[in-house]
Protein backbone atom coordinates (compact mmCIF):
# COMPACT_ATOMS: atom_id res chain seq x y z
CA UNK A 1 0.00 0.00 0.00
CA UNK A 2 1.17 3.51 -0.80
CA UNK A 3 1.09 5.98 2.10
CA UNK A 4 3.02 8.94 0.69
CA UNK A 5 1.68 11.78 -1.42
CA UNK A 6 3.39 14.77 -3.06
CA UNK A 7 1.31 17.90 -3.64
CA UNK A 8 2.68 20.26 -6.29
CA UNK A 9 1.98 23.73 -4.93
CA UNK A 10 4.88 25.78 -6.31
CA UNK A 11 3.11 27.36 -9.30
CA UNK A 12 3.13 31.13 -9.75
CA UNK A 13 -0.64 31.32 -10.14
CA UNK A 14 -0.41 33.79 -13.03
CA UNK A 15 -3.91 32.97 -14.32
CA UNK A 16 -5.33 33.41 -10.83
CA UNK A 17 -3.74 36.86 -10.64
CA UNK A 18 -5.56 38.07 -13.76
CA UNK A 19 -8.79 40.00 -13.43
CA UNK A 20 -11.98 38.10 -14.29
CA UNK A 21 -14.80 40.14 -15.76
CA UNK A 22 -18.15 39.75 -14.05
CA UNK A 23 -16.82 37.73 -11.09
CA UNK A 24 -17.54 39.24 -7.68
CA UNK A 25 -15.12 38.14 -4.97
CA UNK A 26 -14.62 38.96 -1.32
CA UNK A 27 -11.58 40.93 -0.20
CA UNK A 28 -10.21 37.71 1.29
CA UNK A 29 -10.52 35.99 -2.08
CA UNK A 30 -8.91 38.94 -3.83
CA UNK A 31 -5.89 38.99 -1.51
CA UNK A 32 -5.17 35.33 -2.21
CA UNK A 33 -5.82 35.79 -5.95
CA UNK A 34 -3.48 38.76 -6.24
CA UNK A 35 -0.75 36.71 -4.58
CA UNK A 36 -1.44 33.74 -6.88
CA UNK A 37 -1.87 31.54 -3.80
CA UNK A 38 -4.28 28.97 -5.16
CA UNK A 39 -3.59 26.35 -2.48
CA UNK A 40 -4.35 28.96 0.19
CA UNK A 41 -7.46 30.33 -1.50
CA UNK A 42 -10.21 30.49 1.16
CA UNK A 43 -13.24 28.41 0.19
CA UNK A 44 -16.12 28.57 2.64
CA UNK A 45 -13.72 29.60 5.38
CA UNK A 46 -11.06 26.95 4.77
CA UNK A 47 -8.07 27.10 2.41
CA UNK A 48 -8.11 24.90 -0.68
CA UNK A 49 -5.13 23.06 0.79
CA UNK A 50 -7.25 21.73 3.65
CA UNK A 51 -9.64 20.08 1.20
CA UNK A 52 -6.76 18.64 -0.83
CA UNK A 53 -4.96 17.18 2.19
CA UNK A 54 -8.19 15.89 3.72
CA UNK A 55 -8.90 13.94 0.51
CA UNK A 56 -5.44 12.39 0.68
CA UNK A 57 -5.78 11.47 4.34
CA UNK A 58 -9.19 9.89 3.76
CA UNK A 59 -7.62 7.72 1.04
CA UNK A 60 -5.00 6.45 3.48
CA UNK A 61 -2.18 8.72 2.31
CA UNK A 62 -0.99 9.82 5.75
CA UNK A 63 2.46 11.19 4.89
CA UNK A 64 2.22 14.28 2.68
CA UNK A 65 4.89 16.51 1.14
CA UNK A 66 4.01 19.98 -0.14
CA UNK A 67 6.36 21.21 -2.88
CA UNK A 68 6.61 24.95 -2.34
CA UNK A 69 8.62 28.06 -3.21
CA UNK A 70 11.53 29.11 -0.96
CA UNK A 71 9.63 32.15 0.27
CA UNK A 72 6.32 30.33 0.92
CA UNK A 73 6.22 30.80 4.69
CA UNK A 74 2.42 30.74 4.70
CA UNK A 75 2.51 27.22 3.23
CA UNK A 76 4.97 26.12 5.91
CA UNK A 77 2.63 27.47 8.56
CA UNK A 78 -0.27 25.63 6.92
CA UNK A 79 1.72 22.38 6.96
CA UNK A 80 2.43 22.75 10.67
CA UNK A 81 -1.19 23.59 11.42
CA UNK A 82 -2.57 20.61 9.52
CA UNK A 83 -0.01 18.24 11.07
CA UNK A 84 -1.07 19.36 14.53
CA UNK A 85 -4.82 19.05 14.05
CA UNK A 86 -5.04 16.10 11.63
CA UNK A 87 -2.59 13.74 13.29
CA UNK A 88 -0.71 13.28 10.02
CA UNK A 89 2.82 13.99 8.80
CA UNK A 90 2.78 17.06 6.57
CA UNK A 91 6.15 18.40 5.47
CA UNK A 92 7.52 20.71 2.80
CA UNK A 93 10.10 20.39 0.03
CA UNK A 94 11.44 23.45 -1.74
CA UNK A 95 11.51 23.86 -5.51
CA UNK A 96 14.00 26.68 -5.90
CA UNK A 97 12.73 27.97 -9.26
CA UNK A 98 9.41 27.42 -11.10
CA UNK A 99 11.02 25.21 -13.73
CA UNK A 100 8.06 22.92 -14.33
CA UNK A 101 6.23 19.93 -12.91
CA UNK A 102 9.05 17.43 -13.48
CA UNK A 103 11.35 19.67 -11.46
CA UNK A 104 8.68 19.87 -8.75
CA UNK A 105 8.64 16.08 -8.46
CA UNK A 106 12.45 16.02 -8.27
CA UNK A 107 12.25 18.36 -5.29
CA UNK A 108 10.46 15.58 -3.38
CA UNK A 109 13.02 12.83 -4.05
CA UNK A 110 14.34 12.81 -0.49
CA UNK A 111 10.78 12.64 0.81
CA UNK A 112 9.99 9.61 -1.37
CA UNK A 113 13.09 7.81 -0.04
CA UNK A 114 12.73 4.88 -2.43
CA UNK A 115 9.01 4.31 -1.82
CA UNK A 116 6.10 4.50 -4.22
CA UNK A 117 4.11 7.72 -3.89
CA UNK A 118 1.10 9.57 -5.26
CA UNK A 119 1.49 12.94 -7.01
CA UNK A 120 -1.26 15.52 -7.43
CA UNK A 121 -1.83 19.23 -7.97
CA UNK A 122 -2.43 21.62 -5.11
CA UNK A 123 -5.20 23.42 -7.01
CA UNK A 124 -7.32 20.38 -7.88
CA UNK A 125 -9.66 18.29 -5.76
CA UNK A 126 -9.75 14.71 -7.00
CA UNK A 127 -12.40 11.99 -6.60
CA UNK A 128 -11.97 9.81 -3.52
CA UNK A 129 -12.42 6.62 -5.54
CA UNK A 130 -9.39 7.34 -7.73
CA UNK A 131 -7.21 8.38 -4.78
CA UNK A 132 -8.18 5.28 -2.84
CA UNK A 133 -7.42 3.02 -5.77
CA UNK A 134 -3.93 4.47 -6.10
CA UNK A 135 -3.26 4.21 -2.37
CA UNK A 136 -4.28 0.55 -2.21
CA UNK A 137 -1.95 -0.65 -4.96
CA UNK A 138 0.54 -3.27 -3.82
CA UNK A 139 2.86 -3.50 -6.84
CA UNK A 140 5.86 -1.42 -7.85
CA UNK A 141 4.43 -0.20 -11.14
CA UNK A 142 3.39 3.32 -12.11
CA UNK A 143 -0.16 4.54 -12.68
CA UNK A 144 -1.83 7.60 -14.11
CA UNK A 145 -5.52 8.33 -13.69
CA UNK A 146 -7.15 8.87 -17.05
CA UNK A 147 -10.23 11.05 -16.72
CA UNK A 148 -12.89 10.60 -19.38
CA UNK A 149 -13.57 13.93 -21.08
CA UNK A 150 -17.34 13.52 -20.91
CA UNK A 151 -17.15 12.70 -17.21
CA UNK A 152 -15.02 15.76 -16.55
CA UNK A 153 -17.48 17.99 -18.35
CA UNK A 154 -20.47 16.50 -16.52
CA UNK A 155 -19.03 16.46 -13.01
CA UNK A 156 -16.43 19.25 -12.91
CA UNK A 157 -16.28 23.02 -13.17
CA UNK A 158 -14.15 22.62 -16.33
CA UNK A 159 -15.48 24.20 -19.53
CA UNK A 160 -15.22 22.27 -22.84
CA UNK A 161 -12.73 24.73 -24.33
CA UNK A 162 -10.31 24.11 -21.47
CA UNK A 163 -9.86 20.41 -22.22
CA UNK A 164 -7.19 21.23 -24.81
CA UNK A 165 -5.09 22.81 -22.04
CA UNK A 166 -4.50 19.38 -20.49
CA UNK A 167 -2.57 16.36 -21.71
CA UNK A 168 -4.24 13.63 -23.74
CA UNK A 169 -3.38 9.93 -23.47
CA UNK A 170 -3.39 6.86 -25.66
CA UNK A 171 -4.02 3.52 -23.99
CA UNK A 172 -3.54 -0.09 -25.10
CA UNK A 173 -6.37 -2.60 -24.80
CA UNK A 174 -4.75 -4.10 -21.70
CA UNK A 175 -4.70 -0.71 -19.94
CA UNK A 176 -1.05 0.14 -20.54
CA UNK A 177 -0.26 3.78 -21.17
CA UNK A 178 1.20 4.03 -24.67
CA UNK A 179 1.41 7.80 -25.16
CA UNK A 180 0.86 11.13 -23.44
CA UNK A 181 0.97 14.55 -25.11
CA UNK A 182 0.82 17.88 -23.30
CA UNK A 183 -1.66 20.41 -24.73
CA UNK A 184 -2.13 18.70 -28.12
CA UNK A 185 -3.32 21.02 -30.92
CA UNK A 186 -5.98 18.50 -32.01
CA UNK A 187 -7.37 16.54 -29.08
CA UNK A 188 -9.91 14.71 -31.25
CA UNK A 189 -7.22 12.54 -32.79
CA UNK A 190 -6.77 10.94 -29.34
CA UNK A 191 -10.37 9.76 -29.08
CA UNK A 192 -10.59 5.95 -28.94
CA UNK A 193 -13.85 4.00 -28.73
CA UNK A 194 -15.69 7.19 -27.88
CA UNK A 195 -13.37 8.18 -25.02
CA UNK A 196 -10.80 10.93 -24.71
CA UNK A 197 -8.65 10.14 -21.68
CA UNK A 198 -7.40 13.34 -20.08
CA UNK A 199 -4.46 13.68 -17.71
CA UNK A 200 -5.15 15.84 -14.63
CA UNK A 201 -1.78 15.23 -12.94
CA UNK A 202 -2.88 12.42 -10.65
CA UNK A 203 -0.21 9.72 -10.58
CA UNK A 204 1.24 6.90 -8.54
CA UNK A 205 4.97 6.69 -9.17
CA UNK A 206 7.79 4.27 -8.54
CA UNK A 207 11.25 5.74 -7.76
CA UNK A 208 12.22 5.33 -11.44
CA UNK A 209 10.38 8.57 -12.17
CA UNK A 210 13.25 10.59 -10.71
CA UNK A 211 15.80 9.39 -13.26
CA UNK A 212 13.26 10.05 -16.01
CA UNK A 213 12.73 13.60 -14.70
CA UNK A 214 16.48 14.19 -14.77
CA UNK A 215 16.80 12.86 -18.31
CA UNK A 216 14.39 15.22 -20.09
CA UNK A 217 14.97 18.65 -21.60
CA UNK A 218 12.74 21.73 -21.29
CA UNK A 219 9.80 21.91 -23.67
CA UNK A 220 10.92 24.01 -26.68
CA UNK A 221 7.76 26.14 -26.61
CA UNK A 222 6.85 26.41 -22.92
CA UNK A 223 10.47 26.18 -21.69
CA UNK A 224 9.52 24.03 -18.71
CA UNK A 225 10.54 20.58 -17.53
CA UNK A 226 7.19 18.87 -17.92
CA UNK A 227 6.17 15.81 -15.97
CA UNK A 228 4.35 14.43 -19.00
CA UNK A 229 7.71 14.30 -20.83
CA UNK A 230 9.19 12.26 -17.97
CA UNK A 231 6.18 9.95 -18.05
CA UNK A 232 6.59 9.53 -21.82
CA UNK A 233 10.24 8.64 -21.20
CA UNK A 234 9.27 5.94 -18.71
CA UNK A 235 6.73 4.57 -21.19
CA UNK A 236 9.48 4.46 -23.83
CA UNK A 237 11.78 2.54 -21.49
CA UNK A 238 9.06 0.02 -20.67
CA UNK A 239 10.11 -0.52 -17.05
CA UNK A 240 8.46 -0.20 -14.66
CA UNK A 241 5.12 -0.85 -16.30
CA UNK A 242 2.88 2.20 -16.65
CA UNK A 243 -0.86 1.58 -16.52
CA UNK A 244 -3.98 3.72 -16.58
CA UNK A 245 -6.63 3.89 -13.88
CA UNK A 246 -9.85 4.95 -15.62
CA UNK A 247 -12.24 7.43 -14.05
CA UNK A 248 -15.48 8.99 -15.25
CA UNK A 249 -15.70 11.23 -12.18
CA UNK A 250 -15.01 14.95 -12.06
CA UNK A 251 -12.13 17.05 -10.76
CA UNK A 252 -12.64 20.37 -9.02
CA UNK A 253 -10.31 22.90 -10.64
CA UNK A 254 -9.08 26.17 -9.15
CA UNK A 255 -7.09 27.78 -11.96
CA UNK A 256 -8.57 31.26 -12.29
CA UNK A 257 -10.76 33.70 -10.37
CA UNK A 258 -13.82 32.58 -12.29
CA UNK A 259 -13.42 29.10 -10.73
CA UNK A 260 -13.87 30.34 -7.16
CA UNK A 261 -17.70 30.68 -7.04
CA UNK A 262 -18.18 27.27 -8.67
CA UNK A 263 -15.69 25.71 -6.27
CA UNK A 264 -17.56 27.05 -3.26
CA UNK A 265 -20.86 25.76 -4.62
CA UNK A 266 -19.33 22.31 -5.16
CA UNK A 267 -17.95 22.24 -1.61
CA UNK A 268 -21.11 23.46 0.11
CA UNK A 269 -21.88 20.04 1.62
CA UNK A 270 -18.29 18.98 2.18
CA UNK A 271 -17.24 18.30 5.77
CA UNK A 272 -13.55 18.04 6.59
CA UNK A 273 -12.12 15.53 9.05
CA UNK A 274 -9.96 18.12 10.83
Could you say what each language-model-derived stretch is?
Residues 39, 89-91, 176-179, 241-243:
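Conserved beta-strand segments of alpha/beta enzyme cores
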Residues 16, 75-79, 134, 213, ...:
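Hydrophobic packing residues within well-ordered alpha-helices of enzyme cores
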Residues 122-125:
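The conserved acidic donor/metal-binding loop of glycosyltransferases
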Amino acid sequence: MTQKAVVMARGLGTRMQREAEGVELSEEHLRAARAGQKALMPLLGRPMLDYVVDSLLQAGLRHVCLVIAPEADAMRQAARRISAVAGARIECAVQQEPRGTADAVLAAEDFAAGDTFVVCNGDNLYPSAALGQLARLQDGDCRVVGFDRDGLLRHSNIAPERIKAFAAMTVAEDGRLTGIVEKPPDVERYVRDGHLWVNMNLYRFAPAIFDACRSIKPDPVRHELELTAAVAELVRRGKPAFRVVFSEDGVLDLTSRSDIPAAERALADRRLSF
